[in-house]
Amino acid sequence: MLVNAAGCGVFGPFAEADRKKLLASAQLNSLALTGMCHASLPYMHTGSSIINMGSNSAWQPVPYQAVYGASKSYVLSLSRALGRELRPQGIHVMCVCPGWIKTEFQQVAHHDEYIRYVDKWYGPDEVAAQAMQDLKKKKSVSILGHPVRRQVRLVKLLPVDTVMDIWCKQQGIE
């Protein structure tokens, strides 16, 4: 089993962000994950699994964390595509798209100015337990909690601009 759980984010106006940090975030969240998936395939066999850590940010464009959201959308899309490609070999691919998780990520990201509203914090153990349940069921996406499921449904129904307006209003950004 391969678990790609590393991730980082840069929060704040894109134009004001440190370019090296933006590129490092995109590199870790997207390219490093891609490399790990590819490098592990020769060692995978029927019954193997790949679990990629996405985010609830994967479902929509997220102003003031543009690169993070875009990189997590990439992870979701790649996971779904690989899942389809690797199914004939008996290799299962799942993307975990949790809400907010209490980890060191929050201290490193320095996001307090741009993330003010969080409907629920989840513990890493909760996310892992849900992911393992969903992996047993061979789900392609693991979503923990009602708030995230509700968000995913709404994002699919509402126009993109409306979704971004709601996000910015919740965070008190615009």
Model-derived segments and spans:
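Active-site helix of classical SDR
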Residues: 37, 71
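Substrate-binding pocket helix/loop in short-chain dehydrogenase/reductase
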Residues: 13-14, 18-24
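Conserved NAD(P)H cofactor-binding loop of Rossmann-fold oxidoreductase domains
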Residues: 5-10
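Residue(s) in the substrate-gating loop at a strand-loop-helix junction
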Residues: 55
